Amino acid sequence: MKYRISDLKREIRIALDQNKSSEPLRDLGDIDTLSFDDIVGSKIADAAKIVILHAPIHLLGSGIPFGKGIEWKSAEGHGSGSVLLPDDFLRLVVFQMSDWSRAVSEAISPSDAQYALQSSRFPGVRGCPQKPVVAIVNTGVGMMLEFYSCTGGEGVGIKQATYIPKPRILDETIELSHKIKDAVVYYSAYMVAVTMGQREQAQQLLNISQSLLNDTTL
């Protein structure tokens, strides 16, 4: 859902209990020439990114499809493969190959102990169609999603693959799942309070943002 930045700024100011959106800041060093409104606006995209990375997956929506081409490590439909991720990739929503019994929403990284197991000579410890594993790695051509693994042979392909992109402000709007919008507002307010040196207020706002992400009614 698209939200207007002006509307989000207003909600952030309400969260901070501020009424004057253009009041200049004082005694804040290099940023004392910025208006309060400028500082509020500068936090929204970063706050959205952090919230997206930490939110439960069911709050993020269905995501955007990806995965136009597969690179197989050996033969098509056998073993592991990889898919180039979009440049604006931020978080995986779901990935499933057509011969897998279930989808995967949590990816590992090369620093995880489980990643080394995917190269083991013992097949029982590697990912398989019944217990699939995906990893996100940085390569010379960009970020890749590696999947482990397939046994279905020729004709195996991607059944479903979606992701959440990095949040960007375009035409004074930002795309957010409606289920995380309030958490983004309070996290933005938290970041503003930190900038203003209001530590106690910042902690309260952070607690509210985190509690919104843990709300089981969403």
Where are these regions (language model features)?
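Glycine-enriched, solvent-exposed interface loops adjoining structured elements
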Residues: 1-218
